[in-house]
Amino acid sequence: MTAAELTLIDDQVLVACTVDEAMQLLDGPDPIAAWFRATRNETTTTITSAEGDCVLERTSERWHPTDQALTIDGRIGDIHVHAHLTLMAVVHSISDGHVNHGTEIWVHAELGRGSHTRRAARIITAAFAHGLEHIRLELDRSPNVG
């Protein structure tokens, strides 16, 4: 499958906390799914958003806590899906000569061609936005959070 045949969805949030603090909240596939309003069963994940619902049949799932990454492959109907969530330590800000640690939380999905790719993309985009905003509200301790 070429890049031209894929629908790419990316979103990220930068929070004022350490990666270790973020990992306490995002410690595995089940807690991660819950933040994004997704419900996991043995081999499926139901993704719920303001745009509707869809069911991802997981064919592969890899949780790498030491690399702060979750990778999932599967299908939504006839649409091939590859997705991942990663956490990366960053410098959030430097003030008064002090480095303030931060964490970038990045979500990414690649959707192949299918009969309902646009609908699935809308659902996933809304779920990503919802999840990242709730994670930001929970983790971000910067003074401008409100």
Show which residues each predicted segment covers.
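Hydrophobic-ligand-binding modules of eukaryotic lipid transfer/binding families
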Residues: 1-13, 94-98, 126, 141-146
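Hydrophobic/aromatic beta-strand elements that line small-molecule binding cavities or substrate pockets
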Residues: 11-12, 56-62, 72-74, 82-96
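Intrinsic-disorder/low-complexity, polar/charged segments enriched in Ser/Thr/Lys/Arg/Asp/Glu/Gln
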Residues: 6-14, 55, 69, 82, ...
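Hydrophobic pocket/interface hotspot
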Residues: 21-26, 32, 47, 60, ...
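A conserved amphipathic terminal alpha-helix motif
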Residues: 108-146
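Short beta-strand segments that buttress and anchor functional surface loops
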Residues: 45-51, 69-76
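Beta-strand elements of well-folded, non-transmembrane domains
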Residues: 15-17, 89-91, 109-113
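Hydrophobic ligand-binding cavity/cleft-lining segments
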Residues: 1-42
